[in-house]
């Protein structure tokens, strides 16, 4: 997407920092990061196009993130370090703005008209 340079750089920086810290702190602590997708903090249940665009068929909620954080803090994740875990319902695996559900990308080209 155009005009997302700062967002993209920040996301990349988090991933790189996670990897570097996992190496630097190896043997003392495990370091992982979580990159959430669309998370509704009002616990509203979205239907229609909002949910349909998600490969899992729903918008995420805070418990999706909390459950991963709890897992990463547990011994069950004892062999996981240096990972950036994407919790986005599969959105990073598909094109968001494909217009199947009426979603379009506003390029901003006509803003001065």
For each predicted feature, which ranges?
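A glycine/serine/threonine-rich, flexible loop-to-helix segment
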Residues: 3, 33-55, 94-113
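Active-site helix of classical SDR
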Residues: 10, 18
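Generic leucine side-chain signal with a strong bias for well-ordered alpha-helical environments
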Residues: 17, 25, 68-72
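C-terminal helical subdomain
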Residues: 33, 49-80, 87-89, 113
